[in-house]
A protein has these predicted regions:
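Primarily recognizes Gram-negative and organellar outer-membrane beta-barrels
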Residues: 19-22, 42-84, 99-765
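Conserved strand-to-helix beginnings and helix N-cap segments that scaffold or border functional pockets
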Residues: 11, 21-22, 86-89
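Extracytoplasmic
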Residues: 4-6, 31-33, 55-59, 71, ...
Length: 765
C-alpha cells in the first residue's frame, strides 16, 4: 500500500489464512466487497499483554457488504491438454462473522503443488523443473468466539506426489597440481506421501496459547547415475563425453585423460515423522509487569532402507575395479525439550526491560548398518536373502556408525525495548538491544566397528544485538538498522576422529580441534515515498564478517580421483550486499510507470584446498527494468534484465557468466468478451565453460479466456512454452570448484480448462 508492505489480510476484521494474503483476493467475488481498509493493529502478543510491546502489524481488512457477511463461496476447475497434461482443483468456504471452515483439493501433472493458504493464488507451472504428478487435499477450521473468550484454528493437509527428473552436471575442481574436470548425468524417480496437522488454541482471557503440530512423510526413490573425471577438459559437450566413456567403442583420446568413472543404481525407501506441542502463558500482574511461561516438546523419528549397485573403474591399470553391492538400514530418534520463563518490567516512559531464563535439552540416537553383499563370494546380483540375520557376517562395521548425542543449553537473556507509535501523525519508533548468553554442554558417543570416539564441547556462547526502526511523515519514510554478533556452537559430528570410507571417492575425516565460528551481521534499510508521481525508493545494504568459519579441506589424489575431506577453521570470509528499488509514475494519471531494481553482491570466500589456503572473490551485479502502461482493462509491460557473475581465483582463469533477458507482458480485453494474457521473453546465457549451456531460449506463454453466467463460469485456453524453448540451468562457484547444472524442464503443452465460481448467502431476517 503506497510502498508499505501489508503484513496480512483480514476479512471483516478476522484472520483469513493469516500469512497467505493472495487466497482471499483470488476466491472472493468482487461484488461481495464493500470496501478495503488499511490500518495498524497490535500484534497478537501485544493484544494478550494489553500493551504495545512489539511493532504493530499493517493490516488490509476486506469489509464485505452486509448481505454477504454470512454464506458459502467456492470454485472448481478442470482442464485437459496435449502431451497427456491434465489438472483439477476445487475450493469451498463456509463463513460467518466468527467462524470459517474451508476445504480444498488439487490434482495435476503440470508441476503445481500450491493450494489456498500456500502462497495464495492458484497458479500455472510455477516450478518447471522435473515432471511431477501431485494430488492434495486439506482444510481449515477457525472459530473466534464473539465474546472474546477463545480462538481455535485447525488445519490439515495430505499430499501425494510422483516425479521424474533428469540432471546433467559439468564441474571444474581447482587443484594445485592441475584442475580436474567432471561430467555426470542422473535420472531419478520419486514418489511420496505427506501428512500435516496443525492446531492453535488460544484462551484469550487466561492468556494461554497451545500449538500442536504433527508431520509425517514417507518416500520411495530410484536413481541411476553416471559420472567421469578427467585430468584435462575434453572439447566435446557432456552428452558426447558420457556416451563415449560408457559405450563399447570408447574414445582412446578420452581414455588417456580419464581419471575414473562411476555407475551407480540405487533405491531408497523410508519415512520421517515429527510431533510438537508448545504452550505459551501470558499473565499481566497487578503492579503492571508481565510474566510469560513457555514449554515445548518436540519428537522426531526416521527410518531408511536402501540398496545400490556401485561400479567404480580407475584409469590407472594398477587399480582394480571396485564393484560394491550395498544394503543399508538406518533408524534415528530424537527429542527436544524447552522450558522458559520471561519477566517483563514496563516503565511509564514506554521502556520495557525483559529478562528471560530458559533450559533446552536435546537427545538424538542413530543406528546405521551397511552390508556389503559383494563380500559373499556366492552372492548373485538381484538375489536377496530372507532375513537381516543372514547378512550379519557381511556388515561393514567401520562404515556402520552408531551415534548418541546429548545437548543441554542454559539461556539467560536481558533485553531493553522502546516502542512508540503515533497513528494520528503516522510515526513509529522502536529500539531494542539484547544480550543473550547460553551455556552449551554437548556430549556424544560415536562407534564405528571396534573404534569409539567421545567428542564433547562445553562453553559459553554470547549473542549481543541492536535493532532500531523509525517511521515518519505519515509512514512515508522508514529507517531500519540491525547489528548482531553470533557465536555458533560446534557440530559434534565434525569433531569425531574417525574415518568414513563408505564412498570410495570421498573419504570423510573429523577434526577434534575445531573452534566455534563467530559471525558479525550489520544491515540497513531505508524506504521513502515522495513527490506527486507515486515515487518510491527502497535501499537495502548488509555486511557479514565470519571469523573461524568451519570450512572443508579437501585433498585430491590425482592418480585415483579420491578426495579426502576434513573440516577446518579458516579466517578471511566476508560478504557485502546492496540493492536499490525505484518506482515512479511518468504521467499525472499514473497510467505509465517505471520500476528499477539494481543489486550488487560481493563474496570474499576463504577456504582450504590441498592443505593450502585459497581465496575466491566473487562479484554479482544485477539490473532489472520494467516499463508498465495500464488503462482500464489494458496492461502492457516491457521487461529487461541482466546479471553478471564474475569470479577471481589465483591460478585459475577468470570466470565471467552473463545472463540477460528481455520481453513483454500483455493483458487486454478483446471483442466478444474475450480476455488475453500473454508473456514472451528471451533468456540468453553467455560465458559458461560447457558451451552447450550458452543458449538463447525464447519463452512464450499465453492464455485467452471468457466468462459466462455473470462471471461465474470461466473458460480458458492456456499454452505453456509455445516455442518449445524452456531450459533450466544453474551455476555454483566457490573456492574449490565451479559447477554448472542442467535439469529436465516441463515439456510444452496446450490446455483447455473450465472454472465455475459459486456463492450462496442466506437472506437476512
Amino acid at each position: 500500500m503506497n510502498g508499505r508492505k501489508v503484513d496480512y489480510l483480514t476479512l471483516n476484521g478476522k484472520d483469513f489464512f493469516k500469512g497467505n494474503n493472495r487466497i482471499m483476493l483470488d476466491n472472493l467475488s468482487y461484488y461481495t466487497v464493500d470496501k478495503l481498509q488499511f490500518f495498524n493493529q497490535r500484534s497478537e502478543r501485544s493484544q494478550l499483554m494489553g500493551k504495545d510491546v512489539e511493532r504493530p502489524d499493517f493490516i488490509m481488512n476486506v469489509k464485505l457488504k452486509q448481505e454477504y457477511s454470512i454464506g458459502y463461496l467456492g470454485n472448481v476447475e478442470v482442464g485437459a491438454g496435449t502431451h497427456e497434461r491434465w489438472m483439477g482443483r476445487g475450493f469451498a468456504l463456509r463463513f460467518t462473522d466468527n467462524s470459517r471452515i474451508s476445504l480444498f483439493g488439487n490434482a495435476n501433472n503440470v508441476n503445481e503443488s500450491r493450494h489456498p493458504g500456500g502462497d495464495g493464488k492458484w497458479g500455472q507451472s510455477d516450478s518447471p523443473e522435473g515432471d511431477t504428478d501431485t494430488y492434495s487435499v486439506g482444510g481449515e477450521l477457525l472459530v473466534d468466539d464473539k465474546r472474546e473468550r477463545y480462538k481455535e484454528v485447525f488445519n490439515a493437509s495430505l499430499l501425494w506426489n510422483k516425479s521424474h527428473d533428469e540432471q546433467h552436471t559439468t564441474s571444474q575442481q581447482f587443484i594445485q597440481q592441475g584442475d580436474i574436470f567432471g561430467y555426470s548425468s542422473g535420472v531419478t524417480a520419486k514418489q511420496g506421501f505427506k501428512f500435516n496437522i496443525k492446531n492453535k488454541f488460544t484462551l484469550k482471557r487466561v492468556g494461554l496459547i497451545s500449538d500442536t503440530r504433527l508431520d509425517y512423510f514417507d518416500y520411495d526413490n530410484d536413481a541411476v547415475m553416471r559420472s567421469v573425471q578427467f585430468s584435462e577438459q575434453p572439447n566435446e559437450d557432456w552428452t558426447q563425453v558420457l556416451d563415449s566413456i560408457f559405450s563399447t567403442s570408447q574414445s582412446n583420446k578420452m581414455l588417456d585423460i580419464m581419471v575414473n568413472n562411476v555407475q551407480d543404481a540405487s533405491y531408497n525407501s523410508g519415512r520421517r515423522w515429527t510431533a510438537e506441542q508448545k504452550f505459551d502463558y501470558h499473565k499481566s500482574l497487578p503492579w503492571g509487569d508481565d510474566l510469560m511461561l513457555t514449554a515445548r516438546c518436540l519428537w522426531n523419528g526416521a527410518k531408511n532402507d536402501g540398496n545400490s549397485h556401485y561400479w567404480l573403474r580407475y584409469a590407472n591399470g594398477d587399480m582394480p575395479d571396485d564393484v560394491q553391492e550395498r544394503l543399508s538400514r538406518s533408524k534415528s530418534h530424537s527429542y527436544d525439550l524447552h522450558f522458559g520463563v520471561e519477566y517483563a518490567i514496563h516503565f511509564l516512559t514506554g521502556w520495557h526491560l525483559i529478562f528471560d531464563i530458559a533450559h533446552n535439552q536435546q537427545n538424538a540416537d542413530e543406528r546405521n548398518n551397511l552390508y556389503r553383499l559383494d563380500w559373499d563370494e556366492n552372492f548373485r546380483q538381484g538375489e536377496m536373502l530372507q532375513s537381516l540375520t543372514d547378512y550379519l557376517h557381511l556388515r561393514d562395521a567401520n562404515n556402520s556408525p552408531d551415534i548418541d548425542n546429548t545437548k543441554h543449553e542454559e539461556y539467560v537473556t536481558a533485553s531493553l525495548h522502546k516502542h512508540d507509535s503515533d497513528s494520528r501523525r503516522g510515526r513509529y519508533f522502536s529500539f531494542t538491544t539484547a544480550l543473550n548468553a547460553r551455556y552449551v554442554s554437548q556430549d556424544g558417543i560415536y562407534t564405528r566397528g571396534e573404534n569409539t570416539a567421545r567428542p564433547s564441547d562445553h562453553r559459553w556462547l554470547l549473542r549481543p544485538s541492536v535493532d532500531i526502526e523509525y517511521q515518519t511523515r505519515q509512514w512515508h519514510e522508514t529507517y531500519k538498522l540491525h547489528y548482531d554478533t553470533e557465536m555458533r556452537p560446534l557440530n559434534l559430528a565434525q569433531m569425531v576422529d574417525l574415518i568414513d570410507t563408505s564412498n570410495p571417492l570421498a573419504i570423510q575425516k573429523g577434526n577434534p580441534d575445531l573452534r566455534p565460528s563467530i559471525v558479525h551481521n550489520l544491515s540497513f534499510l531505508f524506504s521513502s515515498r515522495f513527490g506527486t508521481h507515486g515515487q518510491f525508493a527502497l535501499l537495502r545494504s548488509s555486511a557479514t564478517v565470519m571469523n573461524s568459519l568451519v570450512a572443508v579441506n579437501s585433498i585430491y589424489d590425482k592418480n585415483t580421483g579420491v578426495s579426502t575431506f576434513m573440516p577446518v577453521n579458516v579466517n578471511g570470509n566476508w560478504a557485502y550486499n546492496s540493492s536499490i528499488d525505484l518506482h515512479r509514475a511518468l504521467t499525472k494519471d499514473r497510467n505509465l510507470n517505471i520500476e528499477s531494481h539494481t543489486s550488487y553482491n560481493y563474496q570474499h570466500s576463504a577456504d582450504i584446498k590441498d592443505n593450502a589456503k585459497s581465496t575466491v572473490k566473487q562479484h554479482i551485479v544485477e539490473q532489472n527494468l520494467k516499463l508498465e502502461y495500464k488503462r482500464k482493462q489494458f496492461a502492457l509491460s516491457l521487461l529487461s534484465g541482466i546479471s553478471w557473475n564474475g569470479m577471481r581465483l589465483i591460478g585459475v582463469d577468470d570466470i565471467n557468466n552473463v545472463n540477460f533477458n528481455y520481453g513483454a507482458n500483455l493483458q487486454a480485453d478483446l471483442p466478444f468478451k474475450l480476455h488475453l494474457s500473454t508473456d514472451i521473453r528471451m533468456y540468453s546465457r553467455r560465458g559458461y565453460a560447457d558451451r552447450s549451456l550458452c543458449t538463447n531460449n525464447l519463452l512464450w506463454n499465453a492464455q485467452i479466456n471468457s466468462t459466462f453466467l455473470n462471471g461465474r463460469l470461466l473458460v480458458a485456453a492456456k499454452a505453456f512454452d509455445l516455442l518449445h524453448q524452456i531450459s533450466s540451468t544453474h551455476t555454483t562457484f566457490n573456492s574449490q570448484a565451479r559447477i554448472e547444472t542442467w535439469r529436465l524442464s516441463l515439456p510444452s503443452y496446450f490446455m483447455l480448462s473450465v472454472q465455475y465460481k459459486f456463492n450462496r448467502n442466506p437472506k437476512r431476517k
